[in-house]
Amino acid sequence: MLDLILKTIWLLLPCYTPNNFAVLVGGGTPIDFGKTFVDGKRILGDGKTWRGFVGGVAGGVLTANLQYAIEKLSGLAIYSSLPFNEFFTLTFLLAFGAMFGDLCGSFIKRRFGYERGSRFLIVDQLMFLLVALLIASLYPPFWKLFTAEIIALAVIITPALHMGINYIAYRLNLKEVPW
């Protein structure tokens, strides 16, 4: 079981890491350009910027390429079992999907009246993952690596990982709130 958990986490790193990169490189022009939706509330808010989105996707792809190099050097063959073009496309879709899922989560939170940085269980912990998996699953090589068992395990472990890592970041004064 531990092997399956570790493999699942390894496969999901390209969608677990983009939001961290987005925070590091973010800022600048909001994706919604400051516009409001028909309900009068901001579409996404100031926390979702073009630089953060692009930087997050690039960070996820960078993470995946580091994984690929580690696999090649160590003899491990998970992502590196795919031809490079399939690996690259798949991991790009995972990273893009994670960032797009985060935008979807922000949109939903704004509609329900949640402010930037406020806690909204399930949306905060799973939206990025579900959208990433949905988008990536449309690309056939996804199914060479992602079994139903891995997808189910991902949905189960991601909220706990998300909350645990955020709590650690909070305790290290890297985040203002523990969620």
UniProtKB/Swiss-Prot annotation:
<keyword id="KW-0444">Lipid biosynthesis</keyword>
<keyword id="KW-0460">Magnesium</keyword>
<keyword id="KW-1003">Cell membrane</keyword>
<dbReference type="GO" id="GO:0046474">
    <property type="term" value="P:glycerophospholipid biosynthetic process"/>
</dbReference>
<keyword id="KW-1208">Phospholipid metabolism</keyword>
<dbReference type="GO" id="GO:0043338">
    <property type="term" value="F:CDP-2,3-bis-(O-geranylgeranyl)-sn-glycerol synthase activity"/>
</dbReference>
<keyword id="KW-0472">Membrane</keyword>
<keyword id="KW-1133">Transmembrane helix</keyword>
<dbReference type="InterPro" id="IPR002726">
    <property type="entry name" value="CarS_archaea"/>
</dbReference>
<feature type="transmembrane region" description="Helical">
    <location>
        <begin position="120"/>
        <end position="140"/>
    </location>
</feature>
<keyword id="KW-0594">Phospholipid biosynthesis</keyword>
<keyword id="KW-0812">Transmembrane</keyword>
<dbReference type="GO" id="GO:0005886">
    <property type="term" value="C:plasma membrane"/>
</dbReference>
<comment type="similarity">
    <text>Belongs to the CDP-archaeol synthase family.</text>
</comment>
<dbReference type="Pfam" id="PF01864">
    <property type="entry name" value="CarS-like"/>
</dbReference>
<keyword id="KW-0443">Lipid metabolism</keyword>
<protein>
    <recommendedName>
        <fullName>CDP-archaeol synthase</fullName>
        <ecNumber>2.7.7.67</ecNumber>
    </recommendedName>
</protein>
<feature type="transmembrane region" description="Helical">
    <location>
        <begin position="88"/>
        <end position="108"/>
    </location>
</feature>
<feature type="transmembrane region" description="Helical">
    <location>
        <begin position="145"/>
        <end position="165"/>
    </location>
</feature>
<keyword id="KW-0808">Transferase</keyword>
<dbReference type="InterPro" id="IPR032690">
    <property type="entry name" value="CarS"/>
</dbReference>
<feature type="transmembrane region" description="Helical">
    <location>
        <begin position="53"/>
        <end position="73"/>
    </location>
</feature>
<comment type="function">
    <text>Catalyzes the formation of CDP-2,3-bis-(O-geranylgeranyl)-sn-glycerol (CDP-archaeol) from 2,3-bis-(O-geranylgeranyl)-sn-glycerol 1-phosphate (DGGGP) and CTP. This reaction is the third ether-bond-formation step in the biosynthesis of archaeal membrane lipids. Can use CTP or dCTP, but not ATP, GTP or TTP.</text>
</comment>
<comment type="pathway">
    <text>Membrane lipid metabolism; glycerophospholipid metabolism.</text>
</comment>
